[in-house]
Curated annotation (Swiss-Prot):
Keywords: Cytoplasm, Methyltransferase, RNA-binding, rRNA processing, S-adenosyl-L-methionine, Transferase. It holds the Pfam family RrnaAD. Its main location: cytoplasm. Specifically dimethylates two adjacent adenosines (A1518 and A1519) in the loop of a conserved hairpin near the 3'-end of 16S rRNA in the 30S particle. May play a critical role in biogenesis of 30S subunits. It comes from Chlamydia muridarum (strain MoPn / Nigg). S-adenosyl-L-methionine binds at residues 27, 29, 54, 75, 95, 118. This is Ribosomal RNA small subunit methyltransferase A. Belongs to the class I-like SAM-binding methyltransferase superfamily. rRNA adenine N(6)-methyltransferase family. RsmA subfamily. GO terms for cellular component: cytosol. It comes from the Bacteria. Its EC number is 2.1.1.182. It catalyses: adenosine(1518)/adenosine(1519) in 16S rRNA + 4 S-adenosyl-L-methionine = N(6)-dimethyladenosine(1518)/N(6)-dimethyladenosine(1519) in 16S rRNA + 4 S-adenosyl-L-homocysteine + 4 H(+).
């Protein structure tokens, strides 16, 4: 019986006198059709190296292995260690937020691989940030199930109410697509919110490199720190206001431009000009 079976899951939990831990965002996927859709979206090929975060009982791990992937899984809850060890995967009982991704090489990881995961919702943003700041060149694709609200935020367009600094951050590194929505009924226990799968195809090259990346994201974080403010006011702690006005005018923007209306490409132009003016 597949690990996506609710009977299999509940039987396991009973056998270890365990339960889903809300503090770890443990809502286990128990729908085989959704697992197959995730696999198709991620485009996992035999021999691919795949990093999985929070495998839990291993429903996703199982289908990744069936596709011929080399899976390294990071799981915080030791309750699942013995069960996961029955699968042909490399399992680490660790906090994914603290795990040094460079150490994947010690496990035989070769070339560019993929991230495929049902991310714990309470650490979605820290993990997405870590994946790209720590080793952006390691990934071909990132396919994750996250809270639907967050999925809509990171796939929003300039001018949308959900458009945010996280949107700009992820688009710097990848093409980001909203793949499909997932009902709470597909989980055990049922979460109180809907979920969604997002697929990111990582760029071969990035617009900036080195310390400029940190400087650029300092600008975008400041811009969105007080999103109802004018851009020039939001950036006043980083750049003189008159300099920001000069750059905006040079690029054809109004002095009343707000941060949530500016695209990644436009932010890059603003950043480069602020460095040069």
């Amino acid at each position: 019986m597949a690990r996506s079976s609710i009977e299999q899951l509940t039987s396991f939990l009973k056998s270890v006198n365990g339960r889903a831990k809300k503090a770890l965002s443990q809502n286990f996927l128990v729908d085989g059709n959704i697992l197959r859709k995730i696999l198709a979206t991620a485009d996992v090929q035999p021999g691919d190296w795949v990093l999985e975060i929070g495998p839990g009982f291993g429903a996703l791990s199982e289908v990744l292995v069936s596709q011929g992937a080399n899976v390294i899984a990071l799981e915080k809850d030791p309750m699942f260690e013995e069960s996961l060890s029955q699968l042909p995967i490399d399992i680490e009982i660790t906090d994914a937020c603290k795990y040094p991704l460079a150490s994947l090489d010690d496990k035989g990881w070769k070339g560019k691989g993929r991230i495929v995961a049902n991310l714990p919702y309470h650490i979605t943003t820290p993990l997405l940030t870590k994946f790209f700041l720590e080793c952006p060149n390691r990934w071909k694709t990132v396919t994750v199930m996250i809270q639907d609200e967050v999925a809509r935020r990171i796939t929003a367009n300039p001018g949308d109410k959900d458009y945010s600094s996280l949107t700009v951050f992820l688009r710097f590194f990848a093409d980001v697509q909203y793949a499909f929505k997932v009902s709470p009924n597909c989980f055990y226990p049922k979460p109180s919110v809907s979920s969604a799968v997002v697929h990111m195809r990582v760029h071969e090259d990035f617009p900036l490199s080195g310390s400029e990346i940190d400087e650029f994201f300092a600008l975008t974080r400041a811009a969105f720190g007080q999103r109802r403010k004018l851009l020039a006011n939001s950036l006043k702690n980083l750049y003189p206001k008159d300099k920001v006005f000069q750059v905006l005018e040079h690029l054809g923007f109004s002095e009343k431009t707000r941060p949530e209306t500016i695209s990644l490409e436009e932010y890059l132009k603003i950043f480069r000009l602020l460095k040069d003016f």
